[in-house]
Amino acid sequence: RRLQNFAWWTYEFGLVKSKPETNHFRRKENDIDYDIYGSGIISSFDETMNIIKCAKGTSNKSKIISYDIEEIVMTSFNYSEIQDRYYVVESMEALYKSFEENEDLFWFEG
């Protein structure tokens, strides 16, 4: 279950801190502090708009929370609703490093 939670809150519904130097890849400059990398967000107009509104402070439907792998692996999700939270990682490198350094979190038996 922990690996499933990790995948959900990262690869499906993850955000990464925006870097201004990547704006030249866009048609329009990013005006929020985050980039979307989660496929569940990218594939959903409603999820995308929810993040934009929450990031701009025009909605409080969901929380945007700093990445914490220990919290993520213990946090369940509802796949049939707009997410109530999104975790923001500093960089993709930080995500991969945290996974490698915390492999023991996924070997829990019980």
Q: What are the functions of these language-model segments?
A:
Residues R1-E109:
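Core of folded catalytic or high-affinity ligand/protein-binding domains
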